[in-house]
């Protein structure tokens, strides 16, 4: 089965072709980071308009890259939610217009399920079951994944997602957009232990997360720097140490909760997915823990940590392979800006 995947939930336009026999044939992505940078964040209307401009050139790119003709495609998968309503509507409209013109069925995909399954795109995918740490700008969850569509939420954030905390911390420190990569880069130049921040809910006894207090601690430190009248090189050094303290605290919590989930479920495989899964400090800490404690940890390729069409094409192929009745042949569709992943559980 050959599936075309279309991702447009936020500020990346992604298209890809995935074949159940041959794997990922082609994928193309356009990021809107440069466009949104001057506003300090995503502007939904601009995001929607840019998806319209980018989708068809990206389609031509993946078709040419893979040598695929439209007659070769069996189905079209698109991100149905969650995400920005306007952006979702663009992708859904393009998917269903192509499906109508080409006489193909469509299937709507949960954006987070795409992230959850994206580590299966590697050459040696992890077998089910596994624990998934889903960590992105909008979500932080620990899931027990038994099979496609068989998900159990073990823990989740009670307030800010980890990626959101990274972005807000970057803004407090005065870094550019997007904040997550910027604060991580700055943290690498900071001195470990120079600034020690709280580890929220580290000893809560459950698998839930909270990052709002960590963000507040960063704000408090910045006010201390201001009161001390730090400037110039001293201020830049203090900011680097603060960034290091923030990243160390966030990573400690994510690793500790992941280890607790593995212990609670007695599973030996951890899958990390979502944009924060590209963070080098997090990967290093989890890999070190895996080597010490004897479990396997799997990550998507760095290029597939961000939103992308490949994960949507994969999820569509896996769903249609198991449940052909999910194929939509009448081209009526809705989008779901708010959509709980747990509702997919079968």
Curated annotation (Swiss-Prot):
GO MF annotation: an example: N(6)-L-threonylcarbamoyladenine synthase activity
Reactions the enzyme catalyzes: L-threonylcarbamoyladenylate + adenosine(37) in tRNA = N(6)-L-threonylcarbamoyladenosine(37) in tRNA + AMP + H(+)
UniProt keyword Iron present: yes
InterPro entries: ATPase_NBD, Gcp-like_dom, KAE1/TsaD, TsaD
GO CC terms: cytoplasm
Purpose: Required for the formation of a threonylcarbamoyl group on adenosine at position 37 (t(6)A37) in tRNAs that read codons beginning with adenine. Is involved in the transfer of the threonylcarbamoyl moiety of threonylcarbamoyl-AMP (TC-AMP) to the N6 group of A37, together with TsaE and TsaB. TsaD likely plays a direct catalytic role in this reaction.
This protein's name: tRNA N6-adenosine threonylcarbamoyltransferase
Lineage of origin: Bacteria, Pseudomonadati, Pseudomonadota, Betaproteobacteria, Burkholderiales
Chain's gene name: tsaD
